[in-house]
């Protein structure tokens, strides 16, 4: 896919989109990302009578998560005095869109900017929308940067700056629904590739920047709100949390959140996984597999997804495939084989396609679904393992080298 296939929307283009209020006063606490009981406490503190607070919370909740408003003045069934009080003390603003890119395959990537909140300067993260036939998946970030330093992952080369708040995690979903026309009274961008019917965002995956389970409480709150039946109403079976293997929090995820689980596996031996996914030194494969087997509600209809990036001459032999089948014995599982997505400066290469197919065939014959993930958004660095904030990338990456690499990969997808 050539660089010409990529469309970058600048600030002028963004201004033409449905207008949402930006965070001009970040010092105000946001009502987004609060559980009902926490929102109720704040409203009572600001003078809302106890006898009214349940009704007021329900009203605000509906406007935030069903109607998708970003301005208190749009809450038409809330009294003027109440709206003025809310505006004076709180915000429901969206993050700033620094840049929006649209890949030739319809994948969209947003670079979003949030307030510093202890980081010393505003921070930026990336959120990616992947349209497919009959579904649209939003890939959400949980941290600014990452601590895990997985050797094949571009995000891992950006040091952790801070965790995202529950508000900032949810804001990615709210903003994407704004931009895609997935709220009432919002228009879908002309020419956008989205599902023909129903919701534009049908699935959410916590597979963006960061390790979600190192930000457990904020991720938990955000996902419980996203799956609330009176709001955004995403089924927990359509929310997938991907982890590199933080074993104690895997148990907590099953008990306290209950969404689908994905494991960034990538190797079947501890020595190799120690190198590819260094958290394995703390939580080795035996402990990780025990946590997976104990995950609540597992069945053939509710499987754990194991992600396995295909690295040439590293982890792609048939012997690796045999060991993978042994490792997953007794776990209802699907194995996503991911052709390695190149990024500037990496020493890894993608496995040959013929080898990937042989690997997949062996796993299929052993009884496991093993789809080969179609690379999406490579031309805008939106594919798996490529996310990294633009401000960080531009300081370290030679743009000409990147463009030369992408031209060399033309036609691969």
UniProtKB/Swiss-Prot annotation:
Gene name per UniProt: rlmN
Q: Which HAMAP family match?
A: RNA_methyltr_RlmN
Mostly located where?
cytoplasm
**Positions annotated as active site in the UniProt record:** 126 (proton acceptor), 384 (s-methylcysteine intermediate)
- Co-factor binding comment: Binds 1 [4Fe-4S] cluster. The cluster is coordinated with 3 cysteines and an exchangeable S-adenosyl-L-methionine.
* Enzyme class, UniProt record, top EC level: transferase
Could you tell me which Gene3D superfamilies the record lists for this protein? 1.10.150.530, Aldolase class I
Provide the species name.
Answer: Sinorhizobium medicae (strain WSM419) (Ensifer medicae)
One Gene Ontology term from the biological process aspect of the record = tRNA methylation
Q: What is this protein called?
A: Dual-specificity RNA methyltransferase RlmN
Q: Where does [4Fe-4S] cluster bind?
A: 146, 150, 153
Catalyzed chemical reaction(s): adenosine(2503) in 23S rRNA + 2 reduced [2Fe-2S]-[ferredoxin] + 2 S-adenosyl-L-methionine = 2-methyladenosine(2503) in 23S rRNA + 5'-deoxyadenosine + L-methionine + 2 oxidized [2Fe-2S]-[ferredoxin] + S-adenosyl-L-homocysteine; adenosine(37) in tRNA + 2 reduced [2Fe-2S]-[ferredoxin] + 2 S-adenosyl-L-methionine = 2-methyladenosine(37) in tRNA + 5'-deoxyadenosine + L-methionine + 2 oxidized [2Fe-2S]-[ferredoxin] + S-adenosyl-L-homocysteine
Which Pfam families does the record match to this protein?
A: Radical_SAM, RlmN_N
Q: What is its EC number?
A: 2.1.1.192
Instruction: Tell me which InterPro entries the record gives.
Output: Aldolase_TIM (IPR013785), Methyltransferase_A (IPR040072), RlmN_N (IPR048641), RNA_MTrfase_RlmN (IPR027492), rRNA_lsu_MTrfase_RlmN/Cfr (IPR004383), rSAM (IPR007197)
